[in-house]
Amino acid sequence: MLQNVTPHNKLPGEGNAGLLGLGPEAAAPGKRIRKPSLLYEGFESPTMASVPALQLTPANPPPPEVSNPKKPGRVTNQLQYLHKVVMKALWKHQFAWPFRQPVDAVKLGLPDYHKIIKQPMDMGTIKRRLENNYYWAASECMQDFNTMFTNCYIYNKPTDDIVLMAQTLEKIFLQKVASMPQEEQELVVTIPKNSHKKGAKLAALQGSVTSAHQVPAVSSVSHTALYTPPPEIPTTVLNIPHPSVISSPLLKSLHSAGPPLLAVTAAPPAQPLAKKKGVKRKADTTTPTPTAILAPGSPASPPGSLEPKAARLPPMRRESGRPIKPPRKDLPDSQQQHQSSKKGKLSEQLKHCNGILKELLSKKHAAYAWPFYKPVDASALGLHDYHDIIKHPMDLSTVKRKMENRDYRDAQEFAADVRLMFSNCYKYNPPDHDVVAMARKLQDVFEFRYAKMPDEPLEPGPLPVSTAMPPGLAKSSSESSSEESSSESSSEEEEEEDEEDEEEEESESSDSEEERAHRLAELQEQLRAVHEQLAALSQGPISKPKRKREKKEKKKKRKAEKHRGRAGADEDDKGPRAPRPPQPKKSKKASGSGGGSAALGPSGFGPSGGSGTKLPKKATKTAPPALPTGYDSEEEEESRPMSYDEKRQLSLDINKLPGEKLGRVVHIIQAREPSLRDSNPEEIEIDFETLKPSTLRELERYVLSCLRKKPRKPYTIKKPVGKTKEELALEKKRELEKRLQDVSGQLNSTKKPPKKANEKTESSSAQQVAVSRLSASSSSSDSSSSSSSSSSSDTSDSDSG
């Protein structure tokens, strides 16, 4: 029994031993114990085996770092320009979407991408590096841009769309970099008070998000604080439209929730996690899809409202937190803003030049003017031989600075600098280069506007000669005219009267407005400079003045002979013409300030302030004196402006023309001056300061052609007695008009002197008639003699007669 039991129990004993020995055998490896675990593992193996099978494909390497506490960074004007201007322009371009995030070789099925491209780079990484102050110098950032474009050209075929897109972006990049500040300067950074709180919120938001596709997160949007945040938001960037401007309520809600987290692209927000689809490089670029980031823990706000905030917030926050904005001065768009200078006003020609400069810097011409906005940065553009070839660089910003600093004395210096800029471009670049074509286009704009330069810089602000000319200058001009007269004493009296009138007018203007006096002083200095230039230019042909002097002397001799021959005939006419002299009083009322006093300046300015030489209806009856001495028929260029003496002489000569000739004068003025075409030809007032130089020259030629024929008549045909009497009476009328004007102008609103002058005229008319022809000839020989000089010469001649 026991034997049976024992052998029988051995079998179970073995099994029991095995079961009882489970503990000891578990410590040692045994097949039985591991089989269940192997079966269990085998049961799960189909699911687990799929994971390493998917991981056999090459994984994307970690993206480039966007912040490094060990690597020093800083904020410079060039880096800020690259961030605010260059990156902003590239980011919103329609071809920028493939470059906004690192290349996902797994999703795009590019297994060899990271074998060929050893240093990946994208605009999102560059942008985040700029936001995190990762770069020490702008050259590092520019190198990243170049790496990104070079990677695209290396990996893709030249005919691929992505290559054309990269070329377009690179061209825009180079255009913007050309306008970058030339010298790199570090900027002072101010740290906002609440930056730590925002950083804590950002860390909390970032820590609550997990992702299978880890990318570095963006630090706080405050431009100054650097953070190394924990894991980030998994997002996929899609095409987005250009974000609109953020309203203030949205900004407030965003600030209360903390800064939004951005993808590797930093500005364009991405879809929620539910929509994770890769974007291939050659996707449709015409239908952008606006998406937004829904950050866990942030308040519930519409995705559409978060999207523009995420895209626009960093630059807006930086601008609001940074009162100093040096790069704004370097932007091409801000170059049009005219900064008022405190260094005095520009002349008329330089104002025109300043307008040309503004147009060259305007957005209208920016497409082909941008290479000339800033000095050529030879080191940044790799033009190592530029300064060897171009000895005098020039650009529009330098021209603008010189204009604001009043470094240009005249328009010629301004034009020389602009043309130097274009010639430098033509000299350095080959003729078929794009920048040469742009330079030619911009130069066409410049030359077209420069050709419209005002002929006379002082014409737009006409001034009465008595106030505009300083006494010394007026005196010198009067002396030059007195040298041409036949009577020295009469010319001295004329100068004294001129100076008295000028002093009266100057005192009135200075008492009325001090600013106007200051302006007049400036214009007087400019006028002196112009006269000096004209004198220097006109001294080229020296032979002509000598001829004029010889002709003057000959004509003086002829006049003297005429005086002797006519003396007897004048006395015969004394009786019949005695009752006629009182008429000038009526004639003066009809003609106003017309007739023009020889002592009152080139355009017949009266002391009372009336400017202009009137050609009234009654003045058409006046007969002219003979040709004035000292003014010969010298041909002048139409464009050359008239001097003070020439205008004065022309005013006197027009008053000498007979009635039948004045119609032609009016016709010339109306034909050449559009503003006077509708005026009444019966009575037209001429202001020589407003007439074009070409009009004045045409009038001068016509007047000279009329007066040149007069001296020849006495030699060929003797005038009958009747004609001589008519000429005598009209000449006397003209002299009395001059005298009345002088007296009324000096006393200015007093009526007694004109009456005295009339009484004196009536009392001495009998004596003056006898010698009127002699006075007429003397007045014709002295074109600039005044009324007082005429009357004095008349009385002296009557005494001698």
Swiss-Prot record:
Residues reported to bind a protein: 112, 155-157, 160-161
Effect of residue 78 to A: Loss of homodimerization
Effect of residue 174 to E: Loss of homodimerization
Biased segments, Acidic residues type: 481-514
Effect of residue 177 to E: Loss of homodimerization
Biased composition (Basic residues): 544-566
Chief location bin: nucleus
Biased composition (Low complexity): 285-298, 763-795
Superkingdom, taxonomy of origin: Eukaryota
Protein family according to the UniProt entry: Belongs to the BET family.
GO BP annotations listed: chromatin looping; chromatin remodeling; neural tube closure; nucleosome assembly; positive regulation of T-helper 17 cell lineage commitment; protein localization to chromatin; regulation of transcription by RNA polymerase II; spermatogenesis
GO molecular function terms attached to this record: acetylation-dependent protein binding; chromatin binding; histone binding; histone H3K14ac reader activity; histone H4K12ac reader activity; histone H4K5ac reader activity; protein serine/threonine kinase activity
Biased composition range(s): Gly residues: 592-612
Protein known as: Bromodomain-containing protein 2
Lineage, opening ranks: Eukaryota, Metazoa, Chordata, Craniata, Vertebrata
Activity control: Inhibited by JQ1, a thieno-triazolo-1,4-diazepine derivative, which specifically inhibits members of the BET family (BRD2, BRD3 and BRD4). The first bromo domain is inhibited by GSK778 (iBET-BD1), which specifically inhibits the first bromo domain of members of the BET family (BRD2, BRD3 and BRD4). The second bromo domain is inhibited by ABBV-744, which specifically inhibits the second bromo domain of members of the BET family (BRD2, BRD3 and BRD4).
Record-linked SMART domains: BROMO
Region (Disordered): 53-73, 268-349, 456-647, 737-801
Known outcome of mutating residue 376 to A: Abolished binding to histone H4 acetylated at 'Lys-12' (H4K12ac)
Domain NET: 632-714
